[in-house]
A protein has these predicted regions:
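Phosphate-handling active-site elements
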Residues: 94-96, 121-128, 258-269
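ATP/NTP phosphate-donor binding region
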Residues: 1-100
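A glycine/threonine-rich phosphate-anchoring loop and its flanking beta-alpha core
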Residues: 9, 114-207
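Residue-level signal for inorganic ion chemistry
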Residues: 20, 43, 79, 130, ...
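Short glycine/serine/threonine-rich phosphate/pyrophosphate-binding segments
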Residues: 108-114, 136, 254
Length: 275
C-alpha cells in the first residue's frame, strides 16, 4: 500500500500531511524529517482509542518526556472545562511554547486540543493524529479549532494550523461501519465541490472505499485533502472561497441541533441529509 505526503502552505504556517498505513509506528522518523524538536510532549488521547495503538505511539516518542491525558470525546466535553484541564497539565509541568501537544483521536478531540494549543502561551507546537475517517479527510487539515457554548456549536475557537498531521489508515480498521460512512459523507461532499472525475471514482469504488481497501481508501482521502489544501491556501480564514467547504452543513447543523447533538445522528450522517 502506498503512502502520500501533502505539503500545505498557508500564510500562518507550512506543514505536511502524511497519509498511509502503520504511520504511527514511524512517527519518530517523521518528526525528525520535519525538523520538529521538543523536550516535552502532552498526548491527549481519545478514550475510544484501542490500547494497542496507544502503546505503539508511546513507544515511538520515548526520546521525549511524555505526559498523557485521557479525553472522553463528546459534544458535552467540547467545553472550556476541557480546555482548562489540558492547560492545567501544561502549566503544572512547565511546558514552554517550544514543547508540543498531540491530539490522538477524532474530530472532537482535534478541535479541543487544537484550541488548547492555540491559547496556551499564545501558541504551542501541535501535532494532529486523527483516528476517524471524517477527521482524516476534513477537520485535521485547515486549522479550524474550537469548542461549544450554550449559544451553539463551535462558536468559540481559533484558526491555528498544526505543525504535522499523521493520517494512519490502520486506525480506521477498528471503527464501526457507521463511523466509516460518516467519513465517506465528507469525501462525497469534497467530490461534489471538486470534480466529476472524483465523483465518478467514488461511485465506481464505493464498496472498496467503505471496506478500506488498499490504495482506494488512500486515494479517496488524498483527493479530499488535496481539495482542502487548494482552498485553504487561497482562503485560510474563510473570508470567501473556503465557505464552499460548508456544502451540506447548513441543514446538517440544523438536524443535529434539533436532536440536541445526540448519538441518534452523527455529524457525517447529518451531512448526508444536508447534501
Amino acid at each position: 500500500m502506498k503512502s502520500e505526503i501533502i505539503k500545505v502552505k498557508t500564510k500562518s504556517k507550512n506543514y505536511e500531511v502524511h497519509i498511509g498505513n502503520n504511520l504511527i509506528s514511524k512517527l519518530r522518523n517523521i518528526i525528525k524529517k520535519n525538523k520538529l524538536s521538543f523536550s516535552k510532549c502532552l498526548i491527549v488521547i481519545d478514550s475510544k482509542i484501542p490500547k494497542k495503538f496507544r502503546t505503539i505511539l508511546l513507544r515511538n516518542l520515548n526520546d521525549q518526556k511524555i505526559f498523557t491525558l485521557n479525553f472522553n470525546a463528546n459534544e458535552k466535553n467540547k467545553s472550556n472545562l476541557s480546555i482548562d484541564k489540558i492547560h492545567n497539565v501544561l502549566f503544572k509541568n512547565n511546558f514552554y511554547r517550544e514543547d508540543c501537544i498531540i491530539s490522538f483521536g477524532g474530530g472532537i478531540t482535534g478541535d479541543v486540543v487544537g484550541y488548547a494549543a492555540s491559547t496556551y502561551k499564545r501558541g504551542i507546537k501541535f501535532i494532529n493524529i486523527p483516528s476517524t475517517l471524517l477527521a482524516q479527510v476534513d477537520s485535521s487539515i485547515g486549522g479550524k479549532t474550537g469548542i461549544n457554548n450554550k449559544f451553539g456549536k463551535n462558536l468559540v475557537g481559533s484558526f491555528y494550523q498544526p505543525d504535522l498531521v499523521i493520517s494512519d489508515i490502520n486506525l480506521l480498521r477498528t471503527l464501526p461501519k457507521r463511523e466509516i460512512i460518516c467519513g465517506y459523507a465528507e469525501i462525497l461532499k469534497s467530490s461534489l465541490i471538486d470534480s466529476k472525475k472524483n465523483f465518478v471514482f467514488l461511485d465506481k469504488n464505493f464498496n472498496k472505499i467503505l471496506n478500506l481497501k488498499g490504495n482506494f481508501i488512500i486515494n479517496a482521502i488524498l483527493n479530499s485533502c488535496l481539495l482542502k489544501k487548494k482552498i485553504i491556501e487561497k482562503d485560510e480564514k474563510e473570508k470567501n472561497l473556503r465557505k464552499s467547504l460548508n456544502l451540506g452543513h447548513t441543514f446538517a447543523h440544523a438536524y443535529e441541533a434539533s436532536l440536541g447533538y445526540s448519538k441518534k445522528l452523527n455529524h457525517g450522517e447529518a451531512v448526508i441529509f444536508g447534501l
